[in-house]
């Protein structure tokens, strides 16, 4: 299978993690006080569990950890849903959250303290960082230069918490910004010093 091939590649390069994504997102998964009757996408969450369970078994056999990314168009689009997936699959040893705080902005999960508190107790596998400005009502996402998006102050608080809590995983920079000219290398160079200043040792 494709997953087994990727796990083999991870072993070859010495990666302890393999990234996975969950299926396309339904907007409302749970509800109360009438919403459970009229608004919830019934069965959408539970339907993904038997789809993902075999992947957990493959990871266990291979001795590797899967990292489910918080994607803005996926069923796991927040650290809350990432943690819930891990708990529902009883897979904390072989499934972690690959946290993209910028993606979580789309569902309005505040990176710090809310997002961090969901995953800090053994659920966090990897973090990758970019800065953004989201406008959910207009269905618009803008990647911003580090420090010019909506996450700058939260990044500082998060970095301090990671140091305080002795996080020993990787925090990587996701280089997806350009100034409008399509040149991602220039965008990288405009962002990397600020990234290192915040998240470096």
Give names to the regions the model predicted.
Residues 182-201:
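C-terminal helical cap(s) of enzyme catalytic domains, especially alpha/beta-barrels
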Residues 75, 79, 83, 103-168, ...:
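Gly/Pro-rich active-site loop or hairpin
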Residues 22-25, 131, 174-175:
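Residues that line or immediately flank small-molecule/substrate-binding pockets and catalytic motifs
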Residues 2, 48-51, 154, 187, ...:
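Hydrophobic alpha-helical membrane-association signature
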Residues 1-97:
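Active-site acidic/histidine proton-transfer and metal-coordination neighborhood
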Residues 10, 66, 82, 100, ...:
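Conserved, mostly hydrophobic/aromatic
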């Amino acid at each position: 299978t494709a997953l087994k091939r990727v796990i083999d590649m991870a072993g070859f390069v010495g990666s302890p993690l393999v990234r996975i994504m969950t299926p396309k997102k339904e907007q409302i998964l749970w509800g109360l006080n009438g919403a459970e009757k009229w608004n919830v996408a019934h069965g959408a969450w539970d339907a993904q569990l038997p789809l993902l369970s075999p992947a957990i078994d493959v990871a266990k056999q291979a001795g590797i950890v899967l990292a489910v990314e918080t994607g803005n168009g996926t069923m796991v689009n927040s650290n809350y849903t990432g943690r819930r997936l891990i708990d529902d699959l009883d897979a904390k040893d072989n499934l972690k959250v690959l946290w993209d705080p910028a993606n979580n902005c789309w569902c309005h999960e505040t990176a710090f303290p809310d997002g961090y508190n969901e995953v800090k107790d053994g659920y966090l596998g990897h973090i990758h960082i970019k800065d953004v400005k989201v406008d959910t009502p207009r269905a618009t996402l803008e990647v911003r230069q580090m420090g010019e998006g909506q996450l700058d102050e939260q990044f500082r608080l998060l970095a301090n918490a990671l140091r305080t809590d002795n996080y020993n995983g990787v925090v990587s920079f996701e280089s997806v910004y350009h100034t409008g000219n399509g040149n991602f290398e220039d965008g990288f160079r405009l962002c990397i010093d600020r990234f290192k200043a915040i998240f470096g040792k």
